[in-house]
């Protein structure tokens, strides 16, 4: 049960305005990363991209008697998301960053991405399934996020997971260039690793 109480905090990334009744994420450790793939006629000649929310903080509100009554809220600012493509030139990376901020995330109009849980359940062993509502660019969709957690020798909890979502579900039109000969795929792959204590 102690494992479950602690791990419910794991998906709280840059949380604000949320009660800290449980363990908290260790700042400046771990990552929250989104992989963006390209397609289209000349998609094979284009670069895939990775973007990352590099500041990870937050805590959980935990019900020790019933894990399903625990709560998770995830909030991080869109302005803190960075393009981390190591193979791109600084100029190209800056252009991708600008496109992401102005056309995809529209950070001035939508400064936050929010995840708020609606249910937590065990999935056997060290697995959890966290259901909730994800809000991007003001549009909310239900999601389910699976995660795996491990207790380290010093008591720190390490958790990681992967999930995917479609940009179009949140009213985002995938970027296209060259008349659609190169375009960003609608589905984005997301992975995270978080440490808390």
Q: Predicted segment positions?
A:
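N-terminal signal peptide c-region/cleavage motif recognized by signal peptidases
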Residues: 14-16
């Amino acid at each position: 049960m102690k494992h479950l109480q602690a791990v419910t905090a794991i998906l709280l990334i840059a949380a604000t305005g949320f009660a800290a009744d449980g363990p908290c994420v260790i700042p400046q450790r771990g990552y929250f990363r989104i992989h963006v793939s390209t397609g289209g006629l000349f998609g094979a000649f284009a670069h895939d991209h990775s973007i990352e929310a590099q500041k990870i903080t937050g805590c959980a509100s935990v019900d020790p008697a019933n894990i399903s009554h625990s709560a998770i809220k995830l909030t991080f600012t869109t302005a803190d998301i960075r393009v981390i493509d190591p193979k791109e030139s600084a100029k190209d990376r800056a252009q991708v960053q600008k496109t992401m901020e102005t056309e995809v995330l529209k950070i001035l109009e939508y400064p936050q991405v929010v995840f708020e849980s609606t249910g937590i359940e065990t999935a056997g062993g060290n697995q959890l399934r966290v259901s909730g509502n994800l809000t991007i660019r003001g549009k909310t969709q239900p999601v389910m996020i699976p995660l795996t957690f491990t207790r380290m020798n010093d008591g720190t909890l390490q958790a990681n997971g992967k999930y995917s979502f479609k940009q179009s579900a949140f009213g985002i039109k995938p970027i296209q260039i060259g008349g659609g000969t190169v375009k960003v795929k609608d589905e984005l792959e997301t992975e995270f690793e978080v440490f808390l204590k």
